[in-house]
Swiss-Prot record:
This is ATP-dependent DNA helicase Q1. The modification N6-acetyllysine is found at K514, K522. The lineage of its organism: Eukaryota, Metazoa, Chordata, Craniata, Vertebrata. One of its GO terms (cellular component) is chromosome. PANTHER family: ATP-DEPENDENT DNA HELICASE Q1 (PTHR13710:SF105), DNA HELICASE RECQ FAMILY MEMBER (PTHR13710). Its main location: nucleus. The gene is Recql.
Amino acid sequence: MASIPALTDELESVSSELHAVDIQIQELTERQHELLQRKSVLTKRIKQCLEDSAAEASGDCDTSPAAWSKEDFPWSGKVKHVLRDVFKLQKFRPLQLETVNATMARKDIFLVMPTGGGKSLCYQLPALCSDGFTLVICPLISLMEDQLMVLQQLGISATMLNSSSSKEHVKCVHTEMMNKNSHLKLIYVTPEKIAKSKMFMSRLEKAYEAGRLTGVAVDEVHCCSQWGHDFRPDYKALGILKRQFPNISLIGLTATATNHVLKDAQKILCVEKCLTFTASFNRPNLYYEVRQKPSSAEDFIENIANLINGRYKGKSGIIYCFSQKDSEQVTISLQKLGVRAGTYHANMEPEDRTKVHTQWSANELQVVVATVAFGMGIDKPDVRFVIHHSMSKSMENYYQESGRAGRDDWRADCILYYGFGDIFRISSMVVMENVGQQKLYEMVSYCQNISKCRRALIAQHFDEVWNADACNKMCDNCCKDDSFEKKNITEHCQALIKILKQAEGLNEKLTPLKLIDAWMGKGAAKFRVAGVAVPALPREDLEKIIVHALLQQYLKEDYSFTAYATISYLKVGPRASLLSNEGHAVTMQVKRSTQSSVRAASPEACEVDSKGKEKSSAVLC
Protein backbone atom coordinates (compact mmCIF):
# COMPACT_ATOMS: atom_id res chain seq x y z
CA MET A 1 0.00 0.00 0.00
CA ALA A 2 1.37 3.38 -1.03
CA SER A 3 2.38 5.74 1.74
CA ILE A 4 0.68 9.08 2.22
CA PRO A 5 3.92 11.04 1.56
CA ALA A 6 4.38 9.21 -1.74
CA LEU A 7 0.79 9.93 -2.76
CA THR A 8 1.20 13.55 -1.72
CA ASP A 9 4.36 13.86 -3.81
CA GLU A 10 2.60 12.38 -6.84
CA LEU A 11 -0.39 14.68 -6.30
CA GLU A 12 1.90 17.71 -6.26
CA SER A 13 3.62 16.44 -9.41
CA VAL A 14 0.30 15.92 -11.19
CA SER A 15 -0.94 19.34 -10.06
CA SER A 16 2.24 20.96 -11.27
CA GLU A 17 1.99 19.24 -14.65
CA LEU A 18 -1.69 20.21 -14.96
CA HIS A 19 -0.75 23.81 -14.25
CA ALA A 20 1.90 23.67 -16.98
CA VAL A 21 -0.65 22.15 -19.38
CA ASP A 22 -3.13 24.94 -18.56
CA ILE A 23 -0.53 27.54 -19.47
CA GLN A 24 0.25 25.70 -22.71
CA ILE A 25 -3.45 25.53 -23.57
CA GLN A 26 -3.80 29.27 -22.98
CA GLU A 27 -0.76 30.02 -25.13
CA LEU A 28 -2.05 27.74 -27.89
CA THR A 29 -5.49 29.37 -27.73
CA GLU A 30 -3.91 32.81 -28.12
CA ARG A 31 -1.81 31.54 -31.01
CA GLN A 32 -4.89 29.97 -32.61
CA HIS A 33 -6.64 33.34 -32.48
CA GLU A 34 -3.64 35.05 -34.15
CA LEU A 35 -3.47 32.38 -36.87
CA LEU A 36 -7.19 32.59 -37.59
CA GLN A 37 -6.89 36.35 -38.03
CA ARG A 38 -3.90 35.93 -40.34
CA LYS A 39 -5.74 33.21 -42.29
CA SER A 40 -8.60 35.62 -42.89
CA VAL A 41 -6.21 38.31 -44.15
CA LEU A 42 -4.38 35.90 -46.46
CA THR A 43 -7.65 34.51 -47.84
CA LYS A 44 -8.77 38.04 -48.73
CA ARG A 45 -5.40 38.78 -50.33
CA ILE A 46 -5.52 35.62 -52.45
CA LYS A 47 -9.07 36.47 -53.54
CA GLN A 48 -7.94 39.96 -54.57
CA CYS A 49 -4.98 38.55 -56.51
CA LEU A 50 -7.26 36.10 -58.34
CA GLU A 51 -9.66 38.92 -59.22
CA ASP A 52 -6.77 41.04 -60.52
CA SER A 53 -5.48 38.12 -62.60
CA ALA A 54 -8.95 37.47 -64.01
CA ALA A 55 -9.33 41.14 -64.91
CA GLU A 56 -5.95 41.12 -66.66
CA ALA A 57 -6.81 37.94 -68.57
CA SER A 58 -10.10 39.44 -69.76
CA GLY A 59 -8.38 42.57 -71.00
CA ASP A 60 -9.72 44.73 -68.20
CA CYS A 61 -6.25 45.31 -66.81
CA ASP A 62 -6.49 48.98 -65.89
CA THR A 63 -7.11 47.97 -62.26
CA SER A 64 -3.44 47.07 -61.84
CA PRO A 65 -0.88 49.79 -61.00
CA ALA A 66 1.40 48.33 -63.69
CA ALA A 67 -1.11 49.39 -66.35
CA TRP A 68 -0.59 53.01 -65.32
CA SER A 69 3.20 53.04 -64.99
CA LYS A 70 3.85 53.83 -68.66
CA GLU A 71 5.20 57.17 -69.86
CA ASP A 72 3.63 57.27 -73.33
CA PHE A 73 0.20 58.69 -72.46
CA PRO A 74 -0.90 61.86 -74.31
CA TRP A 75 -0.24 63.88 -71.15
CA SER A 76 3.09 62.25 -70.20
CA GLY A 77 5.25 65.05 -71.62
CA LYS A 78 3.40 67.74 -69.70
CA VAL A 79 3.46 65.66 -66.51
CA LYS A 80 7.23 65.25 -66.73
CA HIS A 81 7.67 68.98 -67.40
CA VAL A 82 5.55 70.03 -64.39
CA LEU A 83 7.30 67.52 -62.12
CA ARG A 84 10.73 68.88 -63.02
CA ASP A 85 10.11 72.60 -63.52
CA VAL A 86 7.37 73.33 -60.98
CA PHE A 87 7.85 70.78 -58.20
CA LYS A 88 11.66 70.69 -58.72
CA LEU A 89 11.71 66.87 -58.62
CA GLN A 90 13.65 64.57 -60.93
CA LYS A 91 11.63 61.40 -60.47
CA PHE A 92 8.46 59.99 -58.97
CA ARG A 93 8.23 58.01 -55.76
CA PRO A 94 6.56 54.57 -55.78
CA LEU A 95 2.93 54.68 -57.06
CA GLN A 96 3.00 58.45 -57.72
CA LEU A 97 3.28 58.13 -61.51
CA GLU A 98 0.62 55.42 -61.60
CA THR A 99 -1.78 57.54 -59.54
CA VAL A 100 -1.14 60.69 -61.59
CA ASN A 101 -1.79 58.81 -64.85
CA ALA A 102 -5.01 57.24 -63.56
CA THR A 103 -6.20 60.65 -62.35
CA MET A 104 -5.38 62.27 -65.69
CA ALA A 105 -7.45 59.53 -67.35
CA ARG A 106 -10.42 60.61 -65.19
CA LYS A 107 -10.43 57.41 -63.16
CA ASP A 108 -11.65 57.37 -59.57
CA ILE A 109 -8.94 56.09 -57.26
CA PHE A 110 -8.16 55.43 -53.61
CA LEU A 111 -4.49 55.75 -52.69
CA VAL A 112 -3.09 54.24 -49.49
CA MET A 113 0.46 55.49 -49.04
CA PRO A 114 2.67 55.87 -45.93
CA THR A 115 3.14 59.28 -44.39
CA GLY A 116 5.98 60.87 -46.30
CA GLY A 117 5.26 58.91 -49.46
CA GLY A 118 4.14 61.98 -51.40
CA LYS A 119 0.34 61.69 -51.53
CA SER A 120 -0.27 65.42 -52.10
CA LEU A 121 1.67 65.42 -55.37
CA CYS A 122 -0.75 62.81 -56.74
CA TYR A 123 -3.57 65.36 -56.98
CA GLN A 124 -1.58 68.60 -57.14
CA LEU A 125 0.33 67.66 -60.29
CA PRO A 126 -2.78 66.57 -62.29
CA ALA A 127 -4.45 69.82 -61.20
CA LEU A 128 -1.63 71.79 -62.84
CA CYS A 129 -1.91 69.70 -66.01
CA SER A 130 -5.66 70.31 -66.35
CA ASP A 131 -7.52 73.30 -67.73
CA GLY A 132 -9.76 73.85 -64.70
CA PHE A 133 -9.29 73.58 -60.95
CA THR A 134 -9.30 70.75 -58.41
CA LEU A 135 -11.34 70.91 -55.21
CA VAL A 136 -9.45 69.54 -52.19
CA ILE A 137 -11.30 68.52 -49.01
CA CYS A 138 -9.15 68.56 -45.87
CA PRO A 139 -10.19 67.92 -42.26
CA LEU A 140 -8.12 70.68 -40.63
CA ILE A 141 -7.61 74.36 -41.34
CA SER A 142 -4.03 74.04 -40.08
CA LEU A 143 -3.41 71.35 -42.70
CA MET A 144 -4.74 73.61 -45.45
CA GLU A 145 -2.55 76.46 -44.24
CA ASP A 146 0.50 74.20 -44.32
CA GLN A 147 -0.31 73.03 -47.84
CA LEU A 148 -0.87 76.57 -49.10
CA MET A 149 2.43 77.76 -47.67
CA VAL A 150 4.29 75.05 -49.60
CA LEU A 151 2.34 75.68 -52.82
CA GLN A 152 2.97 79.42 -52.65
CA GLN A 153 6.70 78.77 -52.28
CA LEU A 154 6.49 76.74 -55.51
CA GLY A 155 4.61 79.53 -57.30
CA ILE A 156 1.38 77.52 -57.61
CA SER A 157 -1.91 79.44 -57.49
CA ALA A 158 -4.04 77.96 -54.70
CA THR A 159 -6.45 79.23 -52.06
CA MET A 160 -8.77 78.08 -49.31
CA LEU A 161 -12.24 78.88 -48.05
CA ASN A 162 -13.27 78.46 -44.43
CA SER A 163 -15.56 79.99 -41.83
CA SER A 164 -13.15 82.86 -41.18
CA SER A 165 -12.79 83.85 -44.86
CA SER A 166 -13.85 87.45 -45.55
CA LYS A 167 -16.79 88.21 -47.84
CA GLU A 168 -14.40 89.88 -50.27
CA HIS A 169 -12.18 86.79 -50.42
CA VAL A 170 -15.15 84.45 -50.91
CA LYS A 171 -16.51 86.65 -53.71
CA CYS A 172 -13.10 86.73 -55.40
CA VAL A 173 -12.75 82.92 -55.26
CA HIS A 174 -16.27 82.42 -56.62
CA THR A 175 -15.38 84.68 -59.56
CA GLU A 176 -12.14 82.80 -60.23
CA MET A 177 -14.03 79.49 -60.23
CA MET A 178 -15.90 80.64 -63.36
CA ASN A 179 -13.04 82.49 -65.07
CA LYS A 180 -11.66 80.40 -67.95
CA ASN A 181 -8.47 82.48 -67.94
CA SER A 182 -7.87 82.02 -64.21
CA HIS A 183 -4.57 80.55 -63.01
CA LEU A 184 -6.23 79.20 -59.83
CA LYS A 185 -5.59 75.45 -59.71
CA LEU A 186 -6.43 74.24 -56.20
CA ILE A 187 -9.23 75.27 -53.84
CA TYR A 188 -9.00 73.85 -50.31
CA VAL A 189 -12.12 73.54 -48.16
CA THR A 190 -13.17 71.63 -45.06
CA PRO A 191 -15.96 69.02 -45.40
CA GLU A 192 -18.27 71.38 -43.50
CA LYS A 193 -18.20 73.69 -46.53
CA ILE A 194 -19.71 70.94 -48.69
CA ALA A 195 -22.18 69.81 -46.04
CA LYS A 196 -23.48 73.21 -44.96
CA SER A 197 -22.93 75.84 -47.68
CA LYS A 198 -25.66 75.79 -50.34
CA MET A 199 -24.08 78.85 -51.95
CA PHE A 200 -20.75 77.07 -52.44
CA MET A 201 -22.43 73.95 -53.83
CA SER A 202 -24.31 76.17 -56.29
CA ARG A 203 -21.02 77.71 -57.45
CA LEU A 204 -19.46 74.26 -57.82
CA GLU A 205 -22.39 73.14 -59.96
CA LYS A 206 -21.98 76.11 -62.30
CA ALA A 207 -18.22 75.52 -62.48
CA TYR A 208 -18.82 71.86 -63.35
CA GLU A 209 -21.28 72.75 -66.10
CA ALA A 210 -18.74 75.21 -67.52
CA GLY A 211 -16.02 72.55 -67.53
CA ARG A 212 -14.01 74.34 -64.85
CA LEU A 213 -14.26 71.74 -62.05
CA THR A 214 -12.04 68.89 -63.23
CA GLY A 215 -11.27 66.91 -60.09
CA VAL A 216 -11.92 66.33 -56.41
CA ALA A 217 -9.34 65.15 -53.86
CA VAL A 218 -10.51 63.90 -50.47
CA ASP A 219 -7.55 63.99 -48.11
CA GLU A 220 -7.55 61.81 -44.98
CA VAL A 221 -10.34 59.81 -46.60
CA HIS A 222 -10.50 57.41 -43.64
CA CYS A 223 -12.43 60.19 -41.87
CA CYS A 224 -15.49 59.09 -43.90
CA SER A 225 -15.84 55.80 -42.05
CA GLN A 226 -17.19 55.48 -38.53
CA TRP A 227 -14.78 52.53 -38.21
CA GLY A 228 -11.80 54.78 -38.95
CA HIS A 229 -9.61 56.24 -36.21
CA ASP A 230 -10.69 59.82 -36.90
CA PHE A 231 -14.33 59.71 -38.01
CA ARG A 232 -15.87 63.08 -38.88
CA PRO A 233 -19.63 63.18 -39.52
CA ASP A 234 -19.42 65.92 -42.19
CA TYR A 235 -17.31 63.59 -44.36
CA LYS A 236 -20.46 61.49 -44.85
CA ALA A 237 -21.95 64.35 -46.86
CA LEU A 238 -19.19 64.14 -49.49
CA GLY A 239 -21.04 61.45 -51.45
CA ILE A 240 -22.98 64.31 -53.04
CA LEU A 241 -19.89 65.29 -55.05
CA LYS A 242 -19.78 62.19 -57.24
CA ARG A 243 -23.56 62.09 -57.57
CA GLN A 244 -23.76 65.73 -58.71
CA PHE A 245 -20.54 65.74 -60.74
CA PRO A 246 -20.23 62.22 -62.20
CA ASN A 247 -17.63 63.07 -64.86
CA ILE A 248 -14.96 64.38 -62.52
CA SER A 249 -12.14 62.20 -61.24
CA LEU A 250 -12.21 61.63 -57.49
CA ILE A 251 -9.13 60.63 -55.54
CA GLY A 252 -9.25 59.58 -51.89
CA LEU A 253 -5.97 59.63 -49.97
CA THR A 254 -4.92 58.13 -46.65
CA ALA A 255 -1.89 56.71 -44.90
CA THR A 256 -3.87 54.75 -42.35
CA ALA A 257 -6.83 52.69 -43.43
CA THR A 258 -7.62 49.01 -43.06
CA ASN A 259 -9.45 47.18 -45.86
CA HIS A 260 -12.71 47.42 -43.90
CA VAL A 261 -12.39 51.21 -43.58
CA LEU A 262 -11.51 51.60 -47.28
CA LYS A 263 -14.58 49.68 -48.43
CA ASP A 264 -16.81 51.73 -46.15
CA ALA A 265 -15.31 55.03 -47.38
CA GLN A 266 -15.68 54.01 -51.04
CA LYS A 267 -19.35 53.27 -50.47
CA ILE A 268 -19.91 56.62 -48.72
CA LEU A 269 -18.22 58.53 -51.57
CA CYS A 270 -20.16 56.58 -54.24
CA VAL A 271 -17.00 55.18 -55.89
CA GLU A 272 -17.32 51.49 -55.02
CA LYS A 273 -15.72 50.44 -58.33
CA CYS A 274 -12.75 52.77 -58.07
CA LEU A 275 -9.12 51.76 -58.49
CA THR A 276 -7.25 51.09 -55.26
CA PHE A 277 -3.47 51.49 -55.13
CA THR A 278 -1.76 50.47 -51.90
CA ALA A 279 1.90 51.12 -51.17
CA SER A 280 3.88 49.11 -48.65
CA PHE A 281 3.43 50.36 -45.10
CA ASN A 282 7.10 49.76 -44.32
CA ARG A 283 9.50 52.68 -43.86
CA PRO A 284 12.82 50.78 -43.67
CA ASN A 285 14.83 53.81 -42.54
CA LEU A 286 12.76 54.41 -39.39
CA TYR A 287 13.92 52.96 -36.07
CA TYR A 288 10.96 52.27 -33.72
CA GLU A 289 11.47 52.31 -29.97
CA VAL A 290 9.21 52.34 -26.89
CA ARG A 291 10.53 53.65 -23.58
CA GLN A 292 9.12 53.71 -20.09
CA LYS A 293 8.17 57.27 -19.20
CA PRO A 294 10.04 58.48 -16.08
CA SER A 295 7.73 59.07 -13.11
CA SER A 296 9.28 62.47 -12.39
CA ALA A 297 8.26 65.22 -14.82
CA GLU A 298 11.58 66.95 -14.20
CA ASP A 299 13.57 63.79 -14.97
CA PHE A 300 11.45 63.22 -18.07
CA ILE A 301 12.13 66.66 -19.56
CA GLU A 302 15.81 66.35 -18.70
CA ASN A 303 15.85 62.95 -20.42
CA ILE A 304 14.39 64.42 -23.63
CA ALA A 305 16.64 67.49 -23.50
CA ASN A 306 19.73 65.28 -23.13
CA LEU A 307 18.68 63.37 -26.24
CA ILE A 308 18.15 66.54 -28.27
CA ASN A 309 21.32 68.25 -27.07
CA GLY A 310 23.33 65.04 -27.41
CA ARG A 311 22.45 62.45 -30.02
CA TYR A 312 20.29 64.86 -32.02
CA LYS A 313 22.41 67.99 -31.64
CA GLY A 314 21.77 70.26 -34.61
CA LYS A 315 19.20 67.85 -36.05
CA SER A 316 15.58 68.63 -36.78
CA GLY A 317 12.75 66.94 -34.90
CA ILE A 318 9.15 66.90 -33.67
CA ILE A 319 7.77 66.19 -30.19
CA TYR A 320 4.10 65.19 -30.02
CA CYS A 321 2.16 65.93 -26.84
CA PHE A 322 -1.26 64.88 -25.56
CA SER A 323 -2.71 68.37 -25.09
CA GLN A 324 -2.16 72.00 -25.99
CA LYS A 325 -1.24 72.71 -22.37
CA ASP A 326 1.36 69.92 -22.40
CA SER A 327 2.91 71.25 -25.62
CA GLU A 328 3.27 74.74 -24.14
CA GLN A 329 4.76 73.49 -20.86
CA VAL A 330 7.20 71.13 -22.59
CA THR A 331 8.33 73.93 -24.90
CA ILE A 332 9.06 76.27 -21.99
CA SER A 333 10.93 73.54 -20.08
CA LEU A 334 13.05 72.61 -23.10
CA GLN A 335 13.88 76.24 -23.84
CA LYS A 336 15.19 76.58 -20.27
CA LEU A 337 17.49 73.62 -20.99
CA GLY A 338 18.91 75.23 -24.11
CA VAL A 339 16.71 73.65 -26.79
CA ARG A 340 15.51 75.88 -29.66
CA ALA A 341 11.88 74.78 -29.46
CA GLY A 342 8.56 76.26 -30.58
CA THR A 343 4.94 75.37 -29.79
CA TYR A 344 2.34 74.48 -32.43
CA HIS A 345 -1.32 73.68 -31.81
CA ALA A 346 -4.71 74.41 -33.35
CA ASN A 347 -5.70 77.09 -30.82
CA MET A 348 -2.86 79.42 -31.82
CA GLU A 349 -3.38 82.33 -34.17
CA PRO A 350 -2.77 81.28 -37.82
CA GLU A 351 0.11 83.74 -38.20
CA ASP A 352 1.78 82.35 -35.06
CA ARG A 353 1.48 78.79 -36.35
CA THR A 354 2.85 79.83 -39.71
CA LYS A 355 5.76 81.62 -38.03
CA VAL A 356 6.73 78.49 -36.04
CA HIS A 357 6.38 76.30 -39.12
CA THR A 358 8.50 78.69 -41.21
CA GLN A 359 11.22 79.00 -38.56
CA TRP A 360 11.37 75.22 -38.14
CA SER A 361 11.48 74.65 -41.91
CA ALA A 362 14.40 77.10 -42.12
CA ASN A 363 16.14 75.36 -39.17
CA GLU A 364 15.88 78.48 -37.02
CA LEU A 365 13.98 76.25 -34.59
CA GLN A 366 15.33 72.76 -33.98
CA VAL A 367 12.18 71.24 -32.53
CA VAL A 368 8.45 71.78 -32.88
CA VAL A 369 6.52 70.69 -29.77
CA ALA A 370 3.03 70.04 -31.04
CA THR A 371 -0.33 68.38 -30.79
CA VAL A 372 -1.74 66.25 -33.60
CA ALA A 373 -2.65 69.52 -35.39
CA PHE A 374 0.93 69.65 -36.66
CA GLY A 375 2.29 67.47 -39.40
CA MET A 376 -0.30 66.55 -42.01
CA GLY A 377 1.10 67.89 -45.24
CA ILE A 378 4.51 68.66 -43.72
CA ASP A 379 7.18 67.88 -46.29
CA LYS A 380 10.40 68.71 -44.39
CA PRO A 381 12.66 65.85 -45.52
CA ASP A 382 15.40 65.93 -42.87
CA VAL A 383 13.42 65.26 -39.68
CA ARG A 384 15.79 62.98 -37.76
CA PHE A 385 13.56 62.21 -34.79
CA VAL A 386 9.93 62.13 -33.75
CA ILE A 387 9.43 61.81 -30.00
CA HIS A 388 6.04 61.05 -28.48
CA HIS A 389 5.80 62.71 -25.07
CA SER A 390 2.79 60.44 -24.57
CA MET A 391 1.43 57.69 -26.77
CA SER A 392 -1.04 58.35 -29.58
CA LYS A 393 -4.71 57.53 -29.25
CA SER A 394 -4.53 54.82 -31.93
CA MET A 395 -2.10 52.82 -34.02
CA GLU A 396 -3.24 54.77 -37.07
CA ASN A 397 -2.38 58.08 -35.42
CA TYR A 398 0.98 56.80 -34.23
CA TYR A 399 1.91 55.43 -37.64
CA GLN A 400 1.00 58.73 -39.26
CA GLU A 401 2.76 60.94 -36.71
CA SER A 402 5.95 58.86 -36.48
CA GLY A 403 6.02 58.70 -40.28
CA ARG A 404 6.90 62.38 -40.47
CA ALA A 405 10.49 61.43 -39.72
CA GLY A 406 13.09 60.50 -42.33
CA ARG A 407 11.37 61.52 -45.54
CA ASP A 408 14.79 61.86 -47.16
CA ASP A 409 15.15 58.07 -46.70
CA TRP A 410 18.03 58.49 -44.24
CA ARG A 411 17.82 56.89 -40.82
CA ALA A 412 15.51 58.57 -38.33
CA ASP A 413 14.32 57.57 -34.86
CA CYS A 414 10.74 57.23 -33.62
CA ILE A 415 10.76 57.16 -29.82
CA LEU A 416 7.53 56.71 -27.88
CA TYR A 417 7.42 57.31 -24.13
CA TYR A 418 4.79 55.09 -22.55
CA GLY A 419 3.30 55.91 -19.16
CA PHE A 420 0.57 54.27 -17.08
CA GLY A 421 -1.31 57.50 -16.40
CA ASP A 422 -1.43 58.43 -20.09
CA ILE A 423 -3.68 55.45 -20.84
CA PHE A 424 -6.48 56.82 -18.72
CA ARG A 425 -6.01 60.46 -19.73
CA ILE A 426 -6.47 59.43 -23.36
CA SER A 427 -9.23 56.95 -22.57
CA SER A 428 -11.28 59.72 -20.96
CA MET A 429 -10.89 61.72 -24.18
CA VAL A 430 -11.86 58.97 -26.66
CA VAL A 431 -14.65 57.27 -24.68
CA MET A 432 -17.36 58.97 -26.76
CA GLU A 433 -15.83 57.87 -30.07
CA ASN A 434 -17.35 54.84 -31.79
CA VAL A 435 -14.28 52.61 -31.51
CA GLY A 436 -12.08 54.98 -29.52
CA GLN A 437 -11.41 52.70 -26.57
CA GLN A 438 -10.76 49.68 -28.79
CA LYS A 439 -8.20 51.60 -30.83
CA LEU A 440 -6.52 52.98 -27.71
CA TYR A 441 -6.14 49.47 -26.28
CA GLU A 442 -4.53 48.35 -29.56
CA MET A 443 -2.00 51.15 -29.06
CA VAL A 444 -1.43 50.13 -25.44
CA SER A 445 -0.90 46.52 -26.51
CA TYR A 446 1.78 47.69 -28.95
CA CYS A 447 3.54 49.55 -26.13
CA GLN A 448 3.28 46.64 -23.68
CA ASN A 449 4.80 44.16 -26.14
CA ILE A 450 8.44 43.51 -25.22
CA SER A 451 9.44 40.82 -27.70
CA LYS A 452 7.67 41.02 -31.06
CA CYS A 453 9.05 43.06 -33.96
CA ARG A 454 7.48 46.53 -33.98
CA ARG A 455 7.05 46.35 -37.75
CA ALA A 456 5.29 43.01 -37.43
CA LEU A 457 2.90 44.56 -34.91
CA ILE A 458 2.18 47.48 -37.25
CA ALA A 459 1.76 45.13 -40.21
CA GLN A 460 -0.65 42.95 -38.28
CA HIS A 461 -2.76 46.00 -37.47
CA PHE A 462 -2.96 47.09 -41.11
CA ASP A 463 -3.65 43.58 -42.46
CA GLU A 464 -0.22 43.36 -44.07
CA VAL A 465 1.87 40.23 -44.48
CA TRP A 466 5.28 40.82 -42.92
CA ASN A 467 8.41 38.80 -42.25
CA ALA A 468 10.00 40.03 -39.02
CA ASP A 469 13.48 39.19 -40.35
CA ALA A 470 13.06 42.05 -42.84
CA CYS A 471 13.16 44.56 -39.98
CA ASN A 472 16.98 44.47 -40.11
CA LYS A 473 17.14 45.24 -36.39
CA MET A 474 15.48 48.60 -36.90
CA CYS A 475 13.30 48.37 -33.79
CA ASP A 476 14.05 48.00 -30.10
CA ASN A 477 12.54 44.53 -29.78
CA CYS A 478 14.54 43.10 -32.68
CA CYS A 479 17.72 44.50 -31.12
CA LYS A 480 17.27 42.69 -27.81
CA ASP A 481 19.28 39.63 -26.80
CA ASP A 482 16.89 39.01 -23.90
CA SER A 483 15.12 35.69 -23.50
CA PHE A 484 11.54 35.70 -22.25
CA GLU A 485 9.23 33.52 -20.21
CA LYS A 486 5.58 33.42 -19.24
CA LYS A 487 5.05 34.51 -15.65
CA ASN A 488 1.95 33.41 -13.76
CA ILE A 489 0.21 36.52 -12.42
CA THR A 490 -3.09 34.84 -11.45
CA GLU A 491 -2.70 35.65 -7.75
CA HIS A 492 -2.01 39.29 -8.56
CA CYS A 493 -5.18 39.49 -10.66
CA GLN A 494 -7.18 37.82 -7.89
CA ALA A 495 -5.85 40.40 -5.42
CA LEU A 496 -6.96 43.25 -7.70
CA ILE A 497 -10.46 41.78 -7.97
CA LYS A 498 -10.73 41.47 -4.17
CA ILE A 499 -9.75 45.12 -3.71
CA LEU A 500 -12.25 46.29 -6.34
CA LYS A 501 -15.05 44.18 -4.85
CA GLN A 502 -14.37 45.59 -1.39
CA ALA A 503 -14.56 49.13 -2.80
CA GLU A 504 -17.79 48.24 -4.61
CA GLY A 505 -19.23 46.93 -1.33
CA LEU A 506 -18.49 50.31 0.20
CA ASN A 507 -20.20 52.01 -2.76
CA GLU A 508 -16.87 53.52 -3.74
CA LYS A 509 -15.04 53.75 -7.06
CA LEU A 510 -11.30 53.41 -7.54
CA THR A 511 -9.27 55.31 -10.09
CA PRO A 512 -6.28 53.40 -11.49
CA LEU A 513 -3.92 55.33 -9.20
CA LYS A 514 -6.05 54.62 -6.11
CA LEU A 515 -6.18 50.94 -7.05
CA ILE A 516 -2.39 50.75 -7.12
CA ASP A 517 -2.14 52.62 -3.82
CA ALA A 518 -4.57 50.20 -2.16
CA TRP A 519 -2.63 47.24 -3.57
CA MET A 520 0.62 48.68 -2.20
CA GLY A 521 -0.92 49.25 1.23
CA LYS A 522 -1.11 53.01 0.81
CA GLY A 523 -3.99 55.49 0.76
CA ALA A 524 -7.29 55.03 2.59
CA ALA A 525 -7.27 52.03 4.95
CA LYS A 526 -10.84 51.10 4.00
CA PHE A 527 -9.66 49.87 0.59
CA ARG A 528 -7.10 47.44 1.98
CA VAL A 529 -8.23 43.81 2.02
CA ALA A 530 -7.31 41.36 4.76
CA GLY A 531 -5.33 38.50 3.29
CA VAL A 532 -4.09 40.50 0.30
CA ALA A 533 -0.37 40.92 0.85
CA VAL A 534 1.55 43.91 -0.46
CA PRO A 535 3.39 42.55 -3.52
CA ALA A 536 7.18 42.58 -3.44
CA LEU A 537 7.39 44.31 -6.81
CA PRO A 538 8.19 47.88 -7.86
CA ARG A 539 5.27 50.15 -8.72
CA GLU A 540 6.24 50.09 -12.40
CA ASP A 541 5.67 46.32 -12.55
CA LEU A 542 2.34 46.59 -10.74
CA GLU A 543 1.21 49.13 -13.33
CA LYS A 544 2.05 46.69 -16.12
CA ILE A 545 0.13 43.90 -14.40
CA ILE A 546 -2.94 46.14 -14.11
CA VAL A 547 -2.68 47.10 -17.78
CA HIS A 548 -2.32 43.44 -18.78
CA ALA A 549 -5.41 42.55 -16.72
CA LEU A 550 -7.29 45.42 -18.38
CA LEU A 551 -6.33 44.33 -21.90
CA GLN A 552 -7.32 40.74 -21.08
CA GLN A 553 -10.70 41.97 -19.71
CA TYR A 554 -10.21 40.84 -16.11
CA LEU A 555 -10.63 44.54 -15.38
CA LYS A 556 -12.62 47.15 -17.26
CA GLU A 557 -12.91 50.92 -17.31
CA ASP A 558 -15.94 52.83 -16.13
CA TYR A 559 -16.45 56.56 -16.50
CA SER A 560 -17.95 59.40 -14.52
CA PHE A 561 -18.87 62.60 -16.33
CA THR A 562 -18.71 65.95 -14.58
CA ALA A 563 -19.14 69.49 -15.86
CA TYR A 564 -15.37 69.84 -16.10
CA ALA A 565 -13.90 66.40 -16.78
CA THR A 566 -14.41 62.75 -17.61
CA ILE A 567 -12.95 60.52 -14.89
CA SER A 568 -11.82 56.93 -15.52
CA TYR A 569 -12.35 54.26 -12.86
CA LEU A 570 -11.46 50.57 -12.84
CA LYS A 571 -14.05 47.88 -12.14
CA VAL A 572 -14.31 44.10 -12.19
CA GLY A 573 -14.15 42.97 -15.82
CA PRO A 574 -16.21 40.38 -17.76
CA ARG A 575 -13.51 37.67 -17.51
CA ALA A 576 -12.91 38.11 -13.78
CA SER A 577 -15.15 35.16 -12.90
CA LEU A 578 -12.63 32.84 -14.58
CA LEU A 579 -10.16 33.62 -11.80
CA SER A 580 -12.21 31.54 -9.38
CA ASN A 581 -11.63 28.43 -11.52
CA GLU A 582 -8.83 26.38 -10.01
CA GLY A 583 -7.28 25.51 -13.36
CA HIS A 584 -7.44 29.01 -14.85
CA ALA A 585 -4.12 30.83 -15.18
CA VAL A 586 -3.24 34.36 -16.23
CA THR A 587 0.25 34.71 -17.66
CA MET A 588 2.32 37.65 -18.82
CA GLN A 589 5.53 37.69 -20.79
CA VAL A 590 8.58 38.93 -18.88
CA LYS A 591 12.34 38.91 -19.30
CA ARG A 592 14.01 35.77 -18.06
CA SER A 593 16.89 37.85 -16.72
CA THR A 594 16.60 41.07 -14.74
CA GLN A 595 19.72 42.45 -16.38
CA SER A 596 19.28 44.50 -19.51
CA SER A 597 21.00 43.26 -22.62
CA VAL A 598 19.92 45.60 -25.37
CA ARG A 599 22.10 45.38 -28.44
CA ALA A 600 21.65 48.52 -30.51
CA ALA A 601 21.10 48.51 -34.27
CA SER A 602 23.65 51.30 -34.34
CA PRO A 603 25.81 53.02 -31.71
CA GLU A 604 23.01 55.58 -31.40
CA ALA A 605 20.23 53.17 -30.50
CA CYS A 606 20.97 53.14 -26.76
CA GLU A 607 20.38 56.21 -24.68
CA VAL A 608 23.27 57.48 -22.62
CA ASP A 609 22.39 59.03 -19.28
CA SER A 610 24.06 62.00 -17.64
CA LYS A 611 26.70 59.72 -16.10
CA GLY A 612 27.62 58.17 -19.43
CA LYS A 613 26.01 54.81 -18.71
CA GLU A 614 23.77 53.08 -21.22
CA LYS A 615 20.15 52.81 -20.22
CA SER A 616 17.89 50.00 -21.29
CA SER A 617 15.00 50.91 -23.56
CA ALA A 618 13.10 47.80 -22.51
CA VAL A 619 9.50 48.39 -21.51
CA LEU A 620 8.78 45.50 -19.18
CA CYS A 621 10.99 43.89 -16.60
